[in-house]
């Protein structure tokens, strides 16, 4: 199972780095920061489906 450590998030600003991750909501997030901010917003209900685009 793919995991991402989001303990340092949420962050106010994310970089434009492009390293896509696919969330359990079938949405592609452009990088770890954007994904982890979404995880924080979801109160932990969002998880990582896999690395790369959905």
From Swiss-Prot:
Superkingdom of origin? Eukaryota
Signal peptide bounds = none
Q: Which residues are glycosylated?
A: 43
Listed GO molecular functions? serine-type endopeptidase inhibitor activity
Compartments annotated for it: namely: Secreted
* PANTHER family associated with the record: OVOMUCOID-LIKE-RELATED, SERINE PEPTIDASE INHIBITOR, KAZAL TYPE 2, TANDEM DUPLICATE 1-RELATED
Q: Which UniProt keywords apply?
A: Disulfide bond, Glycoprotein, Protease inhibitor, Repeat, Secreted, Serine protease inhibitor
Q: Where is this site: Reactive bond 3?
A: 16-17
Protein's name in the database: Ovomucoid
Q: Which pairs are disulfide-linked?
A: 6-36, 14-33, 22-54
* One of the record's GO cellular component terms: extracellular region
Query: In this protein, which residues make up the domain named Kazal-like?
Result: 4-54
What's the main place this protein lives?
secreted
PROSITE patterns from the UniProt entry: KAZAL_1, KAZAL_2
Q: Where are the transmembrane segments?
A: none
Free-text comment on this protein's domains from its UniProt entry: Avian ovomucoid consists of three homologous, tandem Kazal family inhibitory domains.
InterPro entries under this entry?
A: Bifunctional_prot_inhibitor (IPR051597), Kazal_dom (IPR002350), Kazal_dom_sf (IPR036058), Prot_inh_Kazal-m (IPR001239)
